[in-house]
Amino acid sequence: MKVISSIHELRDQLRGQNRTAFVPTMGNLHEGHLSLMRLARQHGDPVVASIFVNRLQFGPNEDFDKYPRTMEADIEKLQKENVYVLFAPTEKDLYPEPQEYRVHPPHDLGDILEGEFRPGFFQGVCTVVMKLMSCVQPRVAVFGKKDYQQLMIVRRMCNQFALPTDIIAAETVRDADGLALSSRNRYLQAAERAEAPRLAAELNQVREAVLGGERDFAKIERAAMAALAARGWQPDYIAVRKRSNLLPPGPEDANAELVVLAAARLGATRLIDNLEI
């Protein structure tokens, strides 16, 4: 596996490749990330991964400085997955001058849910993804369903800019107790880690209520948030939405068209999760 930081060198290395499969990450790789690499290999060759902790998507009071950086361990894991190239640019490599041009997702998708609680987050995500796509020029790119809203926004962005890249969605990987894998799980204290699967459990409760015929979505959302709050969580949202556009559903929308999404803070750690209904 070649580890490359220069955009020029990356393009030289990939010249002539027309079936490249790309997996962008921020590093601190876990089994969820590695499953993306394996799925990428099913859809293209060679597989290119990137590691870049993107300052543009972190708010002023978020965890950019303490976000876990484990490059040596990450390289070892990617080598075992037979990744062809790891693109690991520095900030100066990717942003040699101030990034004055940004990609702004539409308000109806970028300023709700995660976008409401993390202003500017999706602008930062779209900007770095657009730049990485320009560098790698992949045939396919793999994004996890764990970041459901991000997946939708990136897919729509690629469609509307006519990028020649198909976006492949990967299923969420979970620990045996149901907790969705995340680099931020390492922030959890022992007692918090034991409590953390409750978020997925509440999503399952919402799912079961909807499948059982409940159509008062606001009622079951409030109940789930109250249940988390009673256990010491600080929920930002639990929301049943339409998969197609993340708008609130009506009673006529079929269950198979819905997803429930959640974000909540447990101690100092903010966790997100979702479950398709």
UniProtKB/Swiss-Prot annotation:
Catalysed reactions, semicolon-separated: (R)-pantoate + beta-alanine + ATP = (R)-pantothenate + AMP + diphosphate + H(+)
Residues that span the membrane, as ranges: none
Active site (UniProt): 33 (proton donor)
UniProt binding sites for beta-alanine: 57
Pfam families: Pantoate_ligase
Residue sites binding ATP per the record: 26-33, 144-147, 173, 181-184
Nucleotide-binding keyword on record: yes
Gene3D superfamilies for the chain: HUPs, Pantoate-beta-alanine ligase, C-terminal domain
EC class of the enzyme, as a word: ligase
Signal peptide residues on this chain, from the entry's feature table: none
Keyword ATP-binding: yes
Single GO MF descriptor: ATP binding
Record key words, sorted: ATP-binding, Cytoplasm, Ligase, Nucleotide-binding, Pantothenate biosynthesis
Annotated positions binding (R)-pantoate: 57, 150
One GO term describing the cellular component: cytosol
Entry-linked PANTHER family: CYTIDYLATE KINASE/PANTOATE-BETA-ALANINE LIGASE (PTHR21299), PANTOATE--BETA-ALANINE LIGASE (PTHR21299:SF1)
Note: The reaction proceeds by a bi uni uni bi ping pong mechanism.
Subunit structure: Homodimer.
Function, in words: Catalyzes the condensation of pantoate with beta-alanine in an ATP-dependent reaction via a pantoyl-adenylate intermediate.
Protein name, per record: Pantothenate synthetase
Naturally occurring in which organism (per UniProt): Paraburkholderia xenovorans (strain LB400)
Gene that encodes the chain: panC
